[in-house]
Amino acid sequence: MSRLALTPLLVILLAACAHEPGRNPIAEWVPSPNHDVRDPIIVVIHATEQASVEESLDTLRTRNSGGPVSAHYLVGDDGRIYQLVPDALRAWHAGGGRWGTITDLNSASIGIELDNDGREPFTDVQVDSLLVLLEDLAERHGIPRTAVIAHADMAPTRKRDPGHHFPWATLAAAGFGQWPAGPLVEPPAGFDPWMALRLVGYSLEDRTPHDERAAAARAFHRHFRGIDDGDDPAATLDAEDARILYGLVQ
């Protein structure tokens, strides 16, 4: 069966919710009050790092003085898709950070939470549903298929999710996210991997402190190599990273 084929549950939801404006018919509507208006041009992938989808739904739908959070979608480990905030509104999921020229990710993005405790691999059915959702968002909003990033990519000093278990290669095979094109080759003499990392989208400047560069390297390793460096303050870019980065920017 194709990874992008609609499951029976999604077909049922499509038929049942087609008349509801502002709501995605492939998701179950469980509204959160934590949002305001914005226009999506990118997708940010999160992991809930909580014990259950019920706990995550409660967190994402509760007003609290400690800092209310939400996301547009939550995908359960059973593949069920919940929509909490309409696509046209601004959910509060990204926090501070930057990706390329985008400095307000909440205003620019669709936030997708995945039910995952941060330690276990993501389920196949969950990834299948995510791919269906990404295809839908790309078609309806014109979001570039490459504009799918990790929460940790845009906030590497604060966040690790969705973590090193997330199958970015599977998303790339379906045409989503950035991924090297073709076999990796040695970059030419003078190739600057840190400049390439910046061109990919990571927030780096000439005077970026060492700890922030290390955090960006750790985020890159989780995303493109499936490696968890923990909080290693000495994390840096090696020869394999340079080959990957050359494949991304050439």
Pin down the residues of each PLM region.
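C-terminal motif of bacterial Sec signal peptides marking the signal peptidase cleavage site
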Residues: 14-16
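Short, well-ordered, mixed-charge alpha-helical segments that flank or form enzyme active sites
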Residues: 119-121, 156-159
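Cell-envelope/ECM-targeting effectors and their regulatory/trafficking segments
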Residues: 18-20, 127-142, 158-250
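Acidic/histidine-rich, metal-coordinating catalytic segments
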Residues: 143-158
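Bacterial N-terminal signal peptides that target proteins for export
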Residues: 1-6
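Active-site-adjacent loop/helix surface patches within enzyme catalytic domains
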Residues: 20-36, 41-42, 49-146
